[in-house]
């Protein structure tokens, strides 16, 4: 900004000098000697001539003089060829000075225009600098806020991971325990091999006791391994494509070894026929099935097969029915008091999905909603024989906002939708009566899930997705403590 200001100062100083010079010098230049004729006192005219140049071409000359009858003087003069001003040296100087002043004035105008242009440029630059300074401050503040958010996110992540440190230590201890089991089994195998070679080397009762003890410990370990916290869901495997957009299919988690029957129920209301396939292979590759007719049509897609019986919600009611698939007889009915039905509190996809029956490692469950709980999800643990409610938990999650739900190890997991992008984002732990929001990706391959149930035997999720029967493997995080074995 200093260069344009210096130019302005030079212009102002030059103008002041010119003004001062003109006020002092020009009057003396303008006051030139003139030629005049004056009348003498007494009425006679005297001829008076000023100082004139001697050159006749540059001065006035008296040609003749006389008096008239009244005594007035009459003179005849000859004018010079050119005016006196044009030939006067001082007049030339004045003209030259005026020309210089005009030139300087023009230069000053040019300089002033340039100065004004520079001043405008400087003002523009000043505004740009102010704008850049403001933007820099904004960027600096935004950077600080961004760093603060990153710091908070990292701190939250650290706070989330810090409790896992002792868990990892326990997990390492559990790994050592499993390794110890493996070594004991190897030792027993070696002992049995030696015993087989040398009968009588060891006391049989003592050896049998050691084997039984190890079996109990291994069984307890396997039971602990069966439960855990859900940490991941695999991509779906499409088993079959059949039926309408809505339905359910399942296997019996308590079926004896070798019983691999599959149960298939198409539709969500006003249907009574259940298909039975001999095995998963038959279900995948053939249409050979046995049909069972239920005494009442079912409602929704929340049916389960558990220990040889099918449990379902009777259409347009809050009644649960236990139906024996072998004898084809109703073993028990029970009303879920206050439970909504007939599309009062369904899942987000609708379909009379008011009451959803589930099974996990702990037994039989019912998930529904009531007016008393403002339409939010209610979880009830049921006796699988009598259908009596053993315990109930009221959650704060609206059932109409849930896409689907399933239970693993006593924890209810809820998806945020049934179509498009889906994830598991809510979990309620019944053992602690607490909940948390989670973020577990869930691939919704066919964009319309109407049934999602967990099978503790297969440790897999069974889903009905827009006429496709699919399976998902689950990943559970296990913690086994040695004092629990």
From Swiss-Prot:
InterPro entries: Noelin_dom (IPR022082), Olfac-like_dom (IPR003112), Olfactomedin-like_domain (IPR050605), Quino_amine_DH_bsu (IPR011044). One of its GO terms (biological process) is neuronal signal transduction. Pfam families: Noelin-1 (PF12308), OLF (PF02191). It comes from the Eukaryota. A motif (Endoplasmic reticulum retention signal) lies at residues 482-485. The keyword Glycoprotein applies. Residues 87-227 form a coiled coil. One of its GO terms (cellular component) is extracellular space. The keyword Electron transport does not apply. It is found in: Secreted; Synapse; Endoplasmic reticulum; Cell projection, Axon. Glycans are attached at residues 33, 103, 187, 288, 307, 394, 431, 473. Residues 226-478 form the Olfactomedin-like domain. Keywords: Cell projection, Coiled coil, Developmental protein, Disulfide bond, Endoplasmic reticulum, Glycoprotein, Secreted, Signal, Synapse. Disruption phenotype: Females have slightly lower body weight than wild-type at birth, but strongly reduced body weight one to eight weeks after birth. Mutant females do not display normal estrus cycle responses to male odor, and have very low fertility due to a strongly decreased rate of ovulation and a low mating rate. Expressed in the brain cortex, olfactory bulb and vomeronasal neuroepithelium (at protein level). Detected in brain cortex, hippocampus, dorsal root ganglion and olfactory bulb. Disulfide bonds join 227-409. Its main location: secreted. Residues 1-16 form the signal peptide. SMART domains: OLF (SM00284). The protein structure is stabilized by calcium ions. Contributes to the regulation of axonal growth in the embryonic and adult central nervous system by inhibiting interactions between RTN4R and LINGO1. Inhibits RTN4R-mediated axon growth cone collapse. May play an important role in regulating the production of neural crest cells by the neural tube. May be required for normal responses to olfactory stimuli. The protein contains a globular N-terminal tetramerization domain, a long stalk formed by the coiled coil region and a C-terminal olfactomedin-like domain. Interactions between dimers are mediated by the coiled coil region. The dimers interact mostly via the N-terminal tetramerization domain, giving rise to a V-shaped overall architecture of the tetramer. Homotetramer; disulfide-linked. Dimer of dimers, giving rise to a V-shaped homotretramer. Isoform 1 and isoform 3 interact with RTN4R. Identified in a complex with RTN4R and LINGO1. Peripherally associated with AMPAR complex. AMPAR complex consists of an inner core made of 4 pore-forming GluA/GRIA proteins (GRIA1, GRIA2, GRIA3 and GRIA4) and 4 major auxiliary subunits arranged in a twofold symmetry. One of the two pairs of distinct binding sites is occupied either by CNIH2, CNIH3 or CACNG2, CACNG3. The other harbors CACNG2, CACNG3, CACNG4, CACNG8 or GSG1L. This is Noelin. It comes from Mus musculus (Mouse). The lineage of its organism: Eukaryota, Metazoa, Chordata, Craniata, Vertebrata.
């Amino acid at each position: 900004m200093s260069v344009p200001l210096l130019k302005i100062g030079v212009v102002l100083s030059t103008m002041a000098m010119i003004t001062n010079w003109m006020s002092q010098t020009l009057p003396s230049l303008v006051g030139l000697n003139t030629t005049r004729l004056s009348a003498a006192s007494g009425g006679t005219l005297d001829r008076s001539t000023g100082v004139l140049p001697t050159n006749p071409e540059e001065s006035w000359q008296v040609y003749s003089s006389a008096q008239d009858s009244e005594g007035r003087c009459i003179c005849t003069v000859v004018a010079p060829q050119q005016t006196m001003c044009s030939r006067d040296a001082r007049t030339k100087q004045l003209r030259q000075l005026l020309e210089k002043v005009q030139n300087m004035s023009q230069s000053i105008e040019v300089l002033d225009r340039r100065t004004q242009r520079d001043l405008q440029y400087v003002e523009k630059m000043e505004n740009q600098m102010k704008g850049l300074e403001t933007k820099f401050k904004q960027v600096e503040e935004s950077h600080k806020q961004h760093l603060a958010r990153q710091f908070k996110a990292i701190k939250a992540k650290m706070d989330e991971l810090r409790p896992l440190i002792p868990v990892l230590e326990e997990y390492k201890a559990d790994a050592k325990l499993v390794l110890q089991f493996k070594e004991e089994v190897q030792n027993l195998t070696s002992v049995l091999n030696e015993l087989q070679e040398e009968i009588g080397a060891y006391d049989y009762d003592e050896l049998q006791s050691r084997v039984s003890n190890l079996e109990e410990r291994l069984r307890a370990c396997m039971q602990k391994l069966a439960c855990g916290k859900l940490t991941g869901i695999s991509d779906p495997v499409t088993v079959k494509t059949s039926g309408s957009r809505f339905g359910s299919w399942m296997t019996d988690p308590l079926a004896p070894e070798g019983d691999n029957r599959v149960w298939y129920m198409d539709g969500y209301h006003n249907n009574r026929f259940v298909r039975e396939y001999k095995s998963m292979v038959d279900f995948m590759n053939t249409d050979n099935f046995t049909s069972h007719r239920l005494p009442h049509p079912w409602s929704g897609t929340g049916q389960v097969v558990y220990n040889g019986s099918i449990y379902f919600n009777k259409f347009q009611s809050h009644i649960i029915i236990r139906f024996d698939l072998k004898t084809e007889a109703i073993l028990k009915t029970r009303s879920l008091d206050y439970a909504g039905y007939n599309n009062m509190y369904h899942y987000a996809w609708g379909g009379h999905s008011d009451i959803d029956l589930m099974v996990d490692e702990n037994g039989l469950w019912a998930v529904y909603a009531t007016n008393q709980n403002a339409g939010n999800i209610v979880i009830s643990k049921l006796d699988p024989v009598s259908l009596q409610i053993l315990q109930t938990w009221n959650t704060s999650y609206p059932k109409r906002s849930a896409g689907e739900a399933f239970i693993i190890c006593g924890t209810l997991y809820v998806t945020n939708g049934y179509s498009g992008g889906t994830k598991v984002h809510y979990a309620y732990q019944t053992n602690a009566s607490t909940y948390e929001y989670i973020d577990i990706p869930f691939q919704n391959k066919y964009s319309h899930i109407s049934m999602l149930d967990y099978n503790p035997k297969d440790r897999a999720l069974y889903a009905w997705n827009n006429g496709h029967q699919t399976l998902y493997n689950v990943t559970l995080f296990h913690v086994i403590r040695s004092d629990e074995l």
